[in-house]
Amino acid sequence: MQRNGLIGDTIRSLGFLSRLPLPQGWFDNTDDSLPRNARAFPLAGGILGLLAGVALLIANAISLPPLAAALIAIGALAAMTGALHEDGLGDTADGFFGASTPDRRLDIMKDSRIGTFAALTLVIWTSVKASLLMAIIARAGAGYALLALIGTEAASRAGMLAFWHALPSARPGGLADSMGQPQWETVVCGCGLGLALLAIGFLPSGGMVALINALVLMTVVLFGFARLCMAKIGGQTGDTLGAAQQIGSLAALIGLVMAL
């Protein structure tokens, strides 16, 4: 069993990013750290997107309305990941907009309770993502929505990887800080994989325009979010990494829908 290749990295990335049952043998007797395995984050994301897309296809095949199919896909993603990234998005919203100092913002982000800003953000985010998936189903078909989920979930985790590399840790001793940061080579590999899967997911329905739209929007919004993180807390935390993934996924879907 080749534990240290890309397949092993993908399985270990799935182990970190999801709650899927995975063979324990892939996690034993390996010295690989998460920042190195992170090159496979986009592949893990693509697998999660594929599974969510299958749920969407099944819902569509039994004649559920597009809204129900879209919400089932979103729910499947949250169930598979334990709402890991959604939790980060909510905590980030509470911390950034519920306090006036960096230390207080970080304290709020560690609090497991959900606040007003988190609740509003998650409701709005879910509504917008569902409407975008509905638009893809209506304009292109459920099969293309499946491909879009593969591309979106892969590319957004590549964006998260670049975000993680680019920003310093805002909370010494926190989860993100204790894991270290991915090296440049890891980021390049991960972004290449994310771009490949984004192309596979978007080109069949939206063509090159969709791909360019998604890349431009993801770059702009993640750069803006990085600037916001530096201004609010002086860097990144595990919560902001999750938020970056969520923001990137929404930006990519918007780029596709604009091209349909």
Curated annotation (Swiss-Prot):
Keywords from the UniProt entry: Cell inner membrane, Cell membrane, Cobalamin biosynthesis, Magnesium, Membrane, Transferase, Transmembrane, Transmembrane helix
Compartments (UniProt record): Cell inner membrane
The keyword Transcription is annotated on this UniProt entry: no
Keyword Glycosyltransferase among record annotations: no
Obligatory cofactor(s): Mg(2+)
Transmembrane segments: 42-62, 64-84, 117-137, 144-164, 192-212, 214-234, 240-260
Top-level division of the source organism's lineage: Bacteria
Reaction(s) catalysed by this chain's protein: alpha-ribazole + adenosylcob(III)inamide-GDP = adenosylcob(III)alamin + GMP + H(+); alpha-ribazole 5'-phosphate + adenosylcob(III)inamide-GDP = adenosylcob(III)alamin 5'-phosphate + GMP + H(+)
Recorded topology in the membrane: Multi-pass membrane protein
Family: Belongs to the CobS family.
Function: Joins adenosylcobinamide-GDP and alpha-ribazole to generate adenosylcobalamin (Ado-cobalamin). Also synthesizes adenosylcobalamin 5'-phosphate from adenosylcobinamide-GDP and alpha-ribazole 5'-phosphate.
HAMAP family referenced in this protein's UniProt entry, alphabetically: CobS
Record's protein name: Adenosylcobinamide-GDP ribazoletransferase
Organism: Brucella ovis (strain ATCC 25840 / 63/290 / NCTC 10512)
